[in-house]
């Protein structure tokens, strides 16, 4: 007879994988808009139901190691570890009201995200209205 503890563990671990697959929490690979080359890995996490993202890995040596274009508290901070996504709030299937920092130019933009399937993330950064912006697609790091 199967041990009841084993059955419970298997049952609960299934819920973990299902809920994690439907969440933006995790590591995401970012890509260059023109070449499609991998640029970085961003870890998205949540604190008190507010979502943030920080760069954990760079694929290209050509990227500056510090954010010398950033302003205020992010000026000259190392790119690795830099929190570039701030204050996203889940609203149904989208994550809104946040900002994203472009460490190449030091500018922050309003942003929203939407999970497409389980392993693709649509991210839109914009100024003012969402039609004035740029969309990127990130791939879940597996």
What does each model-identified segment do?
Residues 30-32, 37-102, 108-109:
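Central antiparallel beta-sheet cores of small beta-barrel/beta-sandwich binding domains
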Residues 24-37, 136-141:
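K/E-rich alpha-helical interaction surfaces of small helical-bundle regulatory domains
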């Amino acid at each position: 007879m199967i041990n009841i503890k084993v059955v419970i563990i298997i049952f609960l671990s299934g819920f973990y994988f299902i809920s994690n697959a439907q969440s933006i929490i995790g590591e995401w690979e970012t890509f260059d808009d023109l070449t499609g080359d991998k640029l970085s890995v961003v870890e998205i996490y949540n604190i008190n139901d507010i979502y943030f993202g920080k760069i954990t890995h760079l694929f290209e040596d050509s990227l500056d190691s510090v954010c010398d274009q950033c302003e205020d508290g992010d000026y000259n901070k190392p790119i690795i570890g830099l929190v570039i996504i701030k204050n996203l709030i889940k609203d149904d299937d989208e994550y809104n009201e946040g900002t994203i920092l472009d460490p190449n130019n030091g500018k922050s933009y309003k942003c929203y995200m939407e999970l497409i399937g389980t392993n693709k993330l649509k991210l839109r950064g914009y100024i003012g209205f969402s039609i004035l912006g740029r969309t990127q697609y990130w791939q879940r790091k597996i």
